[in-house]
Design a protein with these regions (language model features):
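N-terminal targeting/trafficking signals and adjacent low-complexity tails
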Residues: 432, 526, 576, 617-666
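Conserved RecA-like P-loop NTPase helicase motor core
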Residues: 434-453, 506-625
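Conserved interdomain hinge at the start of the Helicase C-terminal
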Residues: 384, 441-478
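Conserved RecA-like ASCE P-loop NTPase motor core of nucleic-acid helicases/translocases
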Residues: 52-60, 393-397, 471-478, 482, ...
Length: 666
């Protein structure tokens, strides 16, 4: 029995590891040693890479698909020799192995990745049938055939997945193998922006052109990509896994493996002790955090430890063994490698002991302690891309305000080009409304949302506008809390009922899965207004939520967009407070830019083609200030008028829609 258990447990024993620190290998060679994840994207001898090439990154899968479809329509996507284009995606998007996809659906991305790697190793004879061994000449030829078919004509991700199914070949690794010979590579943000992802894919940006679409998201994405969280529960679970692993394999660990497992145990116990010691939330610089862990932890070579974790894939070994032990007494696996992966990501963040990082510690009596690494300055994360690429294009429909982006690249390399809007200026009407119908000053600060008089004035203002605006009207609130405050007041005063007699009132749901149903109801009401709401519909939305980012309101869906107040982010949030403090004198500009970028994105949901038109009403006297107006998009800024009286905005709005009706008739 003991001999049988030993044999069955061998798959969890970490392989002998020779530290690159002792063998004097370069970082490039170490990257080549990542056998499994990068095997089909790594170069072969004599396998020349296509250069230069274009890397096109965007935020969502649908935007990448749309780009490929547009390429197909150009001369570059047609003819006998179209541009060699390939799309890279995640396992969730591209894996065709039923069991791996099922595990991903049940247990998440990390579990899906773990199962894929297990099948790649081929332990117990269970190798992925879609991925041949790199050492297999026949398999190599089949992968080359996939590459040739993938690059023969322009195809989107769905096409490449179907090609994999037809050829019985893994499209996830097939596209990575194809990327070396592509001229145009489309990929999601994280594969471009994360250094580890670029290394795993062997993406060489030298001399290439990098295009980042939807670039208004770039700074936030960089900061989020390099953030890392670790909870007390994950620390406790990781401690248990390391101790369980040592009880089983301590006598069989040698050299670096034994040393690093012991170091890992010391670090985890220090984190465990700090969780007990801390009684209130606080913020540490990286050196202070390491010092607070106490003992000899500050002397640990975190770079070496993190590299060992990554090279040996010890997280999967420990998690797999913990799952095996768990299964002996439970019915289903717990996928315990997740805790070790969270630890690995956190250690990677700690390896950057620069002045631009902070560790935020949150102490909660119910949920325990949570550590979060926060990157304060996105420039360090973006600099490797800037220094490698021949050119970088930051593109977006609404990029203003631009000053934050100027800090990402050297000033001598930064130029701007802004196209005019596709619609004539006469199709855009902008109005700053500082006063309500009864003369109430409109300034929607945090305190004003608790003032009944202000909310009553807002309801009357919207009621007046609904008499004039045809079809659809989208009203953006700064937050769900402010929307809830307005709705509560209007229900109490029956103002909501009065508004609904003109336009059917719908509100943006907090659950994203319910958004489509609300949009369908909104569009249906506009297309065929009921007698109870003869003037169409009004959609109450939230800045920064689903409707302000990913939804386009063209034609009758948004003949008027109303911005209520200024959506300044919560300045007292710990993360934002740290960013603003780090920015110093530039902090105020950064804060205003965050607000106005959100405003501009919301307004940009309307007017989607050259025949479209819309009015934009800015209900807050602060929109009259130069520092606010100067940050509006040019196509709106040139059309904005400040109205000293509410009635003036009513007349201007009525005149605008009268002109639009006249032009449509002629």
């Amino acid at each position: 029995r003991r001999e049988k258990d030993t044999l069955s447990d061998d798959e969890f024993l970490v392989n002998d590891y020779h530290d690159a620190q002792d063998s004097f290998l370069s970082a490039e060679v170490r990257a080549m040693m990542h056998t499994y994840e990068s095997q089909w994207s790594a170069p072969n001898i004599g396998d020349d890479e296509t250069r230069p090439k274009i890397f096109y990154a965007s935020r969502t899968h649908s935007q990448l698909v749309q780009l490929v479809h547009e390429v197909k329509r150009t001369p570059y996507g047609q003819g006998d020799e179209p541009v060699r284009c390939v799309s890279l995606g995640s396992r969730k998007q591209m894996c065709i192995h039923h069991d791996v996809r099922r595990i991903g659906a049940l247990f998440g991305t990390e579990a899906m990745n773990e199962r894929c790697l297990e099948l790649m190793e081929g332990k117990k004879g269970k190798r992925c049938p879609y991925l041949p061994a790199q050492s297999d000449p026949v398999g190599r030829a089949e992968m080359d055939t996939y590459r040739d078919h993938a690059l023969s004509h322009v195809q989107d991700m769905e096409d490449l997945v179907q090609l994999g199914k037809d050829m019985h070949m893994c499209p996830y690794f097939g596209t990575r193998h194809s990327a070396r010979h592509a001229e145009l590579v489309t990929l999601p943000y994280n594969l471009l922006l994360l250094r580890d992802a670029r290394e795993a894919l062997h993406l060489t940006l030298d001399g290439s052109v990098v295009i980042i679409d939807e670039a208004h998201n770039l700074i936030d994405t960089l900061l989020a990509t390099y953030a890392a969280e670790l909870t007390q529960a994950q620390i406790e679970q990781a401690v248990q896994q390391v101790e369980m692993y040592l009880r089983r394999f301590s006598m069989r660990l040698r050299g670096t493996n034994e040393e690093q497992v012991r170091i890992l145990q010391v670090l985890l116990r220090a984190l465990q002790g700090l969780c007990v010691e801390l009684t209130e939330s606080q913020t540490f610089s990286l050196p202070d955090f390491m010092s607070r862990l106490g003992g000899s932890v500050d002397q640990i070579n975190l770079v070496r430890l993190e590299r060992w974790l990554k090279d040996t894939r010890i997280a999967r070994k420990m998690g797999g063994y913990a799952d095996k032990v768990w299964l002996e007494t439970h019915a289903a696996p717990a996928h315990r490698a997740v805790a070790m992966h969270a630890l690995e990501a956190f250690l990677l963040a700690l390896c950057n002991r620069a002045k631009n990082g902070r560790v935020l510690v949150t102490v909660d009596k119910m949920q325990g302690v949570r550590f979060k690494y926060l990157l304060l300055d996105p420039r360090d994360a973006f600099e490797p891309i800037v220094s490698s690429a021949r050119a970088i294009i930051l593109a977006g429909g609404t990029m203003e305000p631009m000053s934050d982006f100027e800090q990402l690249v050297p000033r001598d390399r930064f130029t701007t080009f802004s196209c005019g809007h596709i619609v004539p200026s006469s199709h855009v009407m902008g109005a700053v409304v500082p006063l309500g119908p009864k003369g109430q000053t409109l300034e929607f600060t945090h305190a004003s949302w608790q003032q009944p008089a202000m909310l009553d004035e807002l309801a009357v203002a919207l009621g007046n506008y609904t008499n004039i605006v045809p079809h659809g009207m989208v009203v953006f609130f700064p937050s769900y809390a402010t929307l809830d405050a307005a709705l509560a007041r209007w229900q109490h005063t029956h103002a909501l009922e009065r508004l609904s007699r003109r336009k059917k009132v719908l509100t943006e749901p907090k659950d994203a899965k319910d958004v489509d149903a609300v949009l369908q109801q909104y569009a249906a009401t506009i297309a065929d207004p009921p007698p109870s709401s003869p003037k169409g519909a009004m959609l109450l939305a939230v800045v920064g939520a689903k409707l302000s980012e990913g939804i386009n309101f063209q034609d009758d869906l948004a003949r008027c967009v109303v911005m209520i107040g200024l959506p300044f982010p919560h300045a007292k949030s710990r993360e934002l407070a740290e960013r603003l403090a780090f920015a110093g004198e530039d902090g105020r500009d950064m804060y205003v830019n965050m607000c106005m970028r959100a405003v501009n994105q919301s307004m940009g949901r309307a007017i989607r083609h050259r025949a479209d038109y819309a009015a934009f009403l800015l209900l807050d006297r602060r929109y009259a200030r130069e520092q606010i107006q100067s940050r509006l998009p040019g196509w709106i800024r040139t059309q904005v008028q400040v109205h000293d009286r509410f009635g003036s905005s009513i007349r201007a709005l009525a005149q605008f829609f009268q002109q639009m009706r006249y032009r449509a008739a002629t």
